[in-house]
Amino acid sequence: MHPDVEQELAYTLLIELMAHQFAYPVRWIETQDHILGEVNAERIIEIGPSPILTNMMKRTIASRFSNSDQALNINRHLMSPDNGNPDIYYKYEPTEEPDLPELGSQSNTVKVSGSPAWEVQRPVTASHIPSGPVDEIEDTKVPVSAILISLLAPKLKKDPRAIPMTGTISNLVGGRSTLSNEIVGDLLAEFPNRVPDKPEEMPLSSLSETLSTSHDGQLGKATSALVMKMVSSRLPGGYSLSNARLYLREKWGLPPRRQDAVFLLALQRQPTSRLLSSTDVDSFLDANAAAYFGQENLSIPSRGSVQSAAPAVDAKALLLAKQQNDALLRDIMGVIQGHTAAKNESQDATLQASDSEAAATKKLDMWISEHGDDYAKGMAPIFDAKKQRIYDSYWNWNAQDTILLFQRKLQGQMSSVKELEQLSTSIVNRACGRTLEQLDYIIAQAERDPTVDSGLLKPMQLLRQTCVETQERQPVFINLSPDMAPLTTISSDGRLIFSEIPRALPCSKILSTNEASSIAFPVSRADGVAVSYSPQLTEILCHDLKDSRRSGFSFSGKNVLLTGAGEGSIGNHILRHLLAGGARVTVTTSSFSEKVTAMFQSIYARHGSKGSVLRVVPFNQGSHGDVQNLVKYIYADASWDLDFILPFAAISENGRDIEDLDSKSEIAHRAMLTNLVRLVGAVASQKRQRDTITRPATVVLPLSPNHGLLGNDGLYSESKRSLETLIPKWSSETWGSYIALAGVIIGWTRGTGLMDSNDVIAQAVESLGVRTFSAVEMAANIVSVMGGRFNAECQETPIIVDMGGGLGSVKNFKAKLTSARQELNAYAELKRLTAQESSRDKAYVATDAHAKTSKRLRGRANILLPLPKNLNYEVDIAPFAASLDGMVDLSRVVVITGFAELGPLGNSRTRWEMEESGTLSLEGCVEMAWLMGLITYHNGIDKKGDHYSGWVDTKTSDAICDDEIPGKYLEFMAKHSGIREVEPEISDNGYDPSKKESLIEVALQRDLAPFETSIETAETLKRQHGDKAIVTQDASSGNCQVQLKAGAVVMVPRASRFNRTVAGQIPLGWTAKRYGISDDIIEQVDPVTLFSLVCTVEALLCSGIIDPYEFYQHIHVSQFANCLGSSMGGLTSLRKMHRDRYLDRSVKSDLVQETFINTTGAWINMLLSSSSGPIRTPVGACASSLESLDTACDLIMLKKAKVCLVGGFEDFVEDLSYEFGCMKATCDTDAEYAAGRVPKEMSRPTASSRSGFVESQGCGVQVLTSAELALEMGLPIFGIVAYTSMAADKAGRSVPAPGKGVLTNAREKSTIPNPMLSLGYRKRLLELRRTQIYQNISDHLDILNSEIALFQESETASPGDLKAFRENRELRIRQDAQAQDAEVTFSLGNQFWKSQDAGDISPIRGSLAVWGLGIDDISVASLHGTSTVQNDLNETMVIQEQMKHLGRRQGNLLPCVCQKWLTGHSKGAAGAWMVNGCLQMMNTGLVPGNRNADNVDEKLREHRHLAFPNTNLQMDDIKACSVTSFGFGQKGGQALLVHPRYLFATIGRERYDGYISKRDKRWRKACFRLSEAMVQGNMVSKCIKTEAPYTSADGVAALLDPTARF
């Protein structure tokens, strides 16, 4: 056959094989069987770049055909191009030939143009050899300084030569903290785990030296990304980074690291646009390489040459041909592997791993079979230092406890003397100068208050005296545990009930009744293996026990490791005692969770004393690794060198005898013995390494008298008994200098996890002569052993204390115990049966009337709007009425008559319930379930065919009663509301932080397959890509085929994971449609407008306004203003306008209008209020709501409006979330999860561990009116807006930096009290001015009489004219007088302080004095409290300095509320939510605690006027609140709200009673409307207007007539 025909057939065969491969599924096993079995092929060749199939076939031959091949003498040869080229082509080693002569003019050329693309080309032989590559120069590390400059230059937008190495990052960025954070983030990415603390404050030269010490000389993540970005965006398509490296190596001889240095230079010299050809790239690389050689003083390499008569073959052409050939082979293999890779790789991996997996599986099965699952799980390590919790803010909890003590005593809420004793002891143990100031203030206030019982003063005075006496001493643990005896009773229905009662006899006498010994706790001394009773040590212990109840023991400065401190355990009570004594304790927990850490935090908050510290870490004592890591963690800080070790961790093995020992018994033995010993040894090793022989750690060994005594407890007894062998080892081994041993034989202890099932027989045990103990008693005894003189004796020799209570000395104890248990159970069973029989007898003999049981009443929700608390006029108002009556101009007093919100916790009512109690009431559950769409109201035929009126499940339509709603939906509501993982289903554009979309620019390296599109689209593609887009038109369809060629630049979507995955979204299921808003409006407006519409209607309902047009019965349409603000407005619309429009998605044509921030206010006016008054749209970032409040107050006080809607709104969207994350303003949720935090813990204002705010979304609205209008209409008044102000900061370069401009609200220079601050003084001045006004009226009336007399004499006017003239003039005279009265009242009342000399009276002092209040009357401060480090420090400093400057009394601590721990930070809406919270606080007197403030920042301790409660404080009276907000862009805002009782004191009893009557009537109607709206789903739709309050014909006249009402 002719070679050309063979070649053609081979080509056809290959194509057919590939087509078959593509068209049919891979059947590799059958193929192998056919080739190897049926055909018995011996010569097998694989076509491809690597031997994938032949390797798999080799394993098949070895496993299945090796024996048969040997028997049949079959010799198989498996070949592939990479290892069998000569054999494939039947080429053999040529014979050796003599050296060729010098190359001459011969020229060997091969014609290749006619060869098929797949044909392997033969090498070209040229008569002229080109110049060879240059020699590679020696490699060297990339200097860190070059990397730093490369990172800084593009960020600073400076020439690299203009960046001095002596400068710092902070100086270079010019105060722009965001840019500084960004650069530091790049450094952390470039040099992971090597960047020093605060690198931005180090000179670049020092930073470079520091980083150079451990740098590997290669580019890191940040610079590599910059280089890759340059290659993809500036070099032509198809030109990769590897091409550039190859060019630099071959032409310039540069090794990899020097290539990196050239790329760094290239970053600084990037072309402004993409290079178009490889020639341009070569020039670009040559220029940068030459610059590098010059920079490094290297000689530019020269190439050698070889003379030849033949023309040289272009090396670049050869390289290009090779690259094209390689690309072709990759394409072919890619096609093949695309159809075979999945199965082949799976089979390959299976074959390779089968043997090793089988062996590993066999070994694992054997291990599991021997040890068991419990053992395997029980030794899994859980220690993680990142999850540590540190509690040391005892100073704040002491202030909180002092407030709680006084409030509970004052309100009669102290549950017992024991609680009073505990609180008082805790306060004394933490007393400092601040505590004394606080007590002084409380006592002084109580003495001045005639309503305070004198019996309250005495304990407070005694407490203060004790604090004075103990202020300088160290904290002490005092054993206050009562001596309790067990008591078991049996109820009438046969239930066993365990309780504890005080023992009848003194403790000392009870202890002496032990059968085993006449001494309570005998002490033995160990001498090697010999253990002997020591009367002297026993006596010492007795004295220590007595001292523990008298003077107590201090553990100040002592470091303790405690394992096994679960709730109710002995270790848990030991922890309380140690903290009370001032110890620094590291406690471990094997069940690390939010609940567990909260338990330990509450223990520290109550018992932690001066200097005490509590560290909590996860730890599994069954894990050897955890033991080692725990000890390393402790000794990483030398100040934590241990003084005591209490290894009390234990695992219950109840119910296991020697026939039932299992893997749990083994892991329990490992935890309670093996690893306990390892723990002691690891500590000894650390002390040995540090040569700490003067500070041995005392190990309290938890021994047991139960040496098999009780039985059925697995290996518990063996574990405890084996611990005793440590005692002789103390002297026989070498670690005795570092460890002291105190063995404590722990007797029967009631109420612990190991013994709680036996509590009911404790009384029977004591009847056997055994002393049992409560967990509190046993813990106090053990701590007494640690704290007294007894501990010093342990340092000399191991000691054993027998606190077994005689348990080990009772003969036949198990039998007696079993008998007692049987008797008890038998008696209980008898009573149970008797009770059952008695019940049956009663049922039998009872009459029908008695047998009937009343039907249980079902709980029903009564959802009501908030109503200001009814006040007792004589008690709450009358005391102020005498001085305040008539002292303000009510038309210019601003009051809040209604409020509403939509946020992560639903509306303002459900949010307050969560803030107040942490759960929802029945009403809250029903409202939240309705709001989330879980229930809907049904009135009609139900599923059963009956008529039903009530709530039904939205999904199933099943009827559901109100009281069933919490049980069915509460868990779901809690999961899908509040701060939580971002839920894509309710996020804008389905945003999922785990799949954050972005585009990357890619230059195509090969032609894409053609795709069909329209002519218009084809034209746009051609316009963009030019000759890189080939367009062909299909005449039949009219469409085009477009093919993008290599070099075309396309944007490819990618999904990355963003580490801000938690936010405070509105509750899942919320929809505006539920409020009756139509689909066309929902489709038209931005989501924030929907939020605002709902909140506006609900705020109006809260004001008692069912129809917004009701206002126009009392005011003109020009007197209704809208001041809602936001930081960014319609973010969803902004995203659509920019991103969706760019991506050519469907976007409505009028979208741009929804991006304007003022559009929301416009929609509210167009749909609801139809006002002609001002629309003010404040944009104050996070302070937008307070700026809105400030704007509205100005409008009302200037009489430009009488009603204002105020507040703010904000959305949560992907872009804003990402940008906040880039600024490091929000918390890194990945780091939070790594620290063991759950989403609801991640917003922690004022906490020492806070790390940034958590975003949220929503809206908040208040209705503001003048007090005069509110009283006239009977609107509920929730608070007086006494003062508002906005303030900027100072010169700087950081936009988000928190400012101090709000301090100006306290500006005043005079230290001498201004008499105008006296309400009585101003009242006298006002009365004097009013007398003058009244006299002026009389004078003008006399003049009027004279004028009328003249008219009468002239006889020119009729009597009717004279009468009209008199009436008109008298009216004007009296109106002028009223205006003068209002003006003088305003100047001497509302804003008297503004008329004083500049700086004489501060705005805060003056606005409070208007209502007869002072700086000490501010009862609570609602902080912006974002949970960022700098804001919380700055804001508290501002409030502290205001209080200090204005003379707030020492000890009058101002509770600070940080609402964002619950709601997150909603930016524009945040201030409105805070105002709502303050109104609710004033109405209830409750100050809610920041429950996420587990440990308050030590830096806040210096603010002596402030307190940071993490629990609720019930105050008797909240007179005034301060609200502060700080927004990006130097927006600082502060408002003062005052309780409405002070307003009511200005109007008189009669007017007040009339107002209350109108208010209550209005409130009842509004509540009915709220219920109706929930049932009918028309809360908003019923208020939506289609026409103005006036007819179109009357429109002009209505606007021009100020007296027009509708």
Swiss-Prot record:
Gene behind this protein: apf5
Domain spans labelled Carrier: 142-218
Gene3D superfamilies: 3.30.70.2490, 3.40.47.10, 3.90.25.70, 6.10.140.1410, NAD(P)-binding Rossmann-like Domain
Enzyme Commission identifier(s): 2.3.1.41
Pathway it works in: Secondary metabolite biosynthesis
GO cellular component, one term: fatty acid synthase complex
Protein name: Fatty acid synthase apf5
GO BP term, pick one: long-chain fatty acid biosynthetic process
Role: Fatty acid synthase; part of the gene cluster that mediates the biosynthesis of the cyclic tetrapeptide apicidin F (APF). The non-ribosomal peptide synthetase apf1 incorporates four different amino acids to produce apicidin F: L-phenylalanine, D-pipecolic acid (D-pip), N-methoxy-L-tryptophan and L-2-aminooctanedioic acid. L-Phenylalanine is the only proteinogenic amino acid directly used by apf1. The 3 other apf1 substrates are non-proteinogenic and have to be modified by other enzymes of the cluster.
